[in-house]
Structure formats: structure tokens, C-alpha cells
Amino acid sequence: DVQMTQSPSYLAASPGESVSISCKASNKSISNNLAWYZZKPGKANKLLISSGSTLQSGTPSRFSGSGSDTDFTLTIRSLEFQDFAVYYCZZYNEPYYTFGAGTMLELKR
């Protein structure tokens, strides 16, 4: 099985800052079969990026995805208040569909 190691598990940042989240696949290349999701309380997970770097309709351009094979990164530039949420990577290199453990992005106090 492919294991997805996501880091960090927790991030604190302020509006206007930029943050990056890493996701690494163990054992084998997953090509670019990697998606990023945003989770907010009481809402369905929102697909932000597929194929490693393809922004979905409605995903703001301040979000970007990069990487291939085993190493991937989600970057959010110029954070806005609505960006504070939990983010997950998911690899979908059949027959596997494996999520990372998530990254909680919180407002820095």
C-alpha cells in the first residue's frame, strides 16, 4: 500500500502570509495523481487541486500545487481569513486512494 505522509500537522499563520504543506508518498511513484482538499466544520470537503497542480473551478489563484512522483506541495499565498481550515492530500493512483493525516491551519494569536 501507498502511505501518504503529510506535514506539518499544525500551522499557525496570519492573514497576508504564505504557507506551504508537504505530502510525500512512500514506496512508489504516484505520478501526478494527487489532490488537495479543504475541510471546514459542517461543510463537505472541497476539492481544491487535482493532478498535483490543476486548480478546480472556484479555487482562488492564491492556491497552487506542485510536485510529482513522490513529493508534493500545496502553497497558499496572501492568506485570507476564509483560508483557515484543515487541508488534506489524497493520492488516487489506482487501486489505492489514500489520504494524508491532515494539516490544521489556524489563525496566529
From Swiss-Prot:
Gene Ontology, cellular component aspect: immunoglobulin complex
GO biological process, one term: immune response
Region (Complementarity-determining-3): 90-98
Residue segments, region Framework-4: 99-108
Framework-2: region residues: 36-50
InterPro entries registered for this protein in UniProt: Ig-like_dom, Ig-like_dom_sf, Ig-like_fold, Ig_sub, Ig_V-set, IgV_Light_Chain
Residue numbers spanned by region Complementarity-determining-2: 51-57
CDD domains: IgV_L_kappa
Region of interest (Framework-3), residue spans: 58-89
Pfam families per record: V-set
Record bears the keyword Thylakoid: no
The keyword Ion transport appears for this protein: no
Region (Framework-1): 1-23
Region ranges (Complementarity-determining-1): 24-35
Keywords, alphabetical: Adaptive immunity, Bence-Jones protein, Immunity, Immunoglobulin
SMART domains the record matches: IG, IGv
Disulfide bond residue pairs: none
Extra information: This is a Bence-Jones protein.
Protein name: Ig kappa chain V region S211
